[in-house]
């Protein structure tokens, strides 16, 4: 295991997130085949109003900021067009030991989302320290992919990475991630109601400090399902077991954050409205629910609120450095 920058336990929840404000959001034909949550092509996609998407984006950023979350907003570049740039958690993750991890993406038109200037902006504006780059993007040459915290649901506090194999989540790359960042793996097959592989683990489940949301019905192997539930209980998580319908409404695509004002769970209005009163009460016993309506992003992009947020766990520096000095440990962080 590579040496870490700190031996302190990693907190589960971040107080800071990266969001990327899109310039060319839209239905992406290169991702549609592997994402059953992504809907609408043709005329309906062509009539999508960018202003509606930007309003949804701004509403989420504003709601999080009002709740005390530090939101670092990067601007998507107009060229080349990047229809999924609003989902930065698929290409980058930031860790408490100073590690920045970059990930291989299935769709060729998503790979230009990995932009060094975004990482530099995060480090500069947040006054963060970066000590190591783990760049897995070279695995794209082998047609092997691992799409960040879309493919991975991380129990950071207990060093367990949950993942369901799919065209976007390769077991070999998963093993490399686990070795580089010192995670135990819990893998399982997950299918939607039409018996298709679920594209990303983070629509199947979410993990907070003391709870986990899981679609048990999607984990088709009974032994795998029992193992996942047993591991979650052993690590102190109260389980909210959602249905396949609720999974389709992004009820598993939620994220707990920990600003100074108190913990919150970010989710979409669609997800919130799908919860039963009992499920909602259980979640509210752990954190406040912050729900925002993002119907266009969910419908055309096939991702929910959690997909729009890349948590920032990087350690702070004593002073604000220049971008290049702060990123001195990074070697060619984009492909």
Task: Report residues per predicted region.
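The feature marks the mature, well-folded catalytic cores of soluble enzymes
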Residues: 1-335
């Amino acid at each position: 295991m590579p040496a870490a920058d700190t031996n302190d336990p990693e907190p589960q929840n971040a107080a800071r997130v990266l969001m990327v404000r899109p310039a060319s959001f839209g239905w992406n034909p290169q991702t549609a085949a592997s994402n059953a949550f992504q809907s609408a092509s043709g005329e309906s996609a062509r009539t999508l109003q960018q202003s509606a998407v930007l309003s949804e984006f701004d509403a989420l950023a504003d709601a999080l900021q009002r709740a005390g979350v530090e939101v670092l907003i990067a601007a998507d570049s107009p060229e080349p067009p990047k229809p999924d740039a609003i989902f930065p958690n698929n290409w980058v993750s930031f860790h408490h030991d100073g590690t920045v991890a970059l990930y291989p993406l299935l769709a060729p038109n998503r790979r230009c989302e990995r932009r060094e200037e975004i990482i530099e902006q995060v480090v500069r504006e947040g006054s963060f320290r970066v000590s190591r780059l783990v760049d897995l993007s070279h695995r794209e040459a082998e047609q092997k992919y691992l799409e960040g915290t879309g493919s991975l649901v991380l129990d950071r506090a207990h060093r367990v990475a949950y993942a369901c194999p799919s065209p976007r989540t390769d077991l070999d790359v998963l093993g490399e991630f686990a070795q580089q960042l010192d995670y135990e793996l819990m893998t399982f097959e997950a299918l939607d109601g039409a018996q298709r592989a679920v594209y990303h683990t983070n629509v199947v489940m979410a993990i907070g400090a003391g709870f986990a949301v899981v679609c048990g019905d999607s984990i088709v192997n009974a032994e795998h399902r029992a193992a996942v539930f047993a591991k979650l209980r052993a690590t102190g998580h109260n389980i909210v077991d959602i249905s396949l319908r609720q999974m389709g409404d992004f009820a598993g695509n939620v994220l707990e954050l920990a600003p100074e004002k108190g913990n919150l769970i970010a989710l979409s209005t669609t997800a919130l409205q799908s919860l039963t009163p009992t499920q909602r009460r259980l979640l509210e016993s752990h954190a406040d629910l912050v729900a925002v309506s993002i119907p266009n992003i969910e419908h055309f992009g096939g991702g929910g609120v959690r997909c729009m947020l890349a948590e920032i766990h990087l350690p702070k520096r004593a002073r604000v450095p220049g971008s290049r000095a702060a990123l001195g440990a990074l070697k060619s962080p984009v492909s």
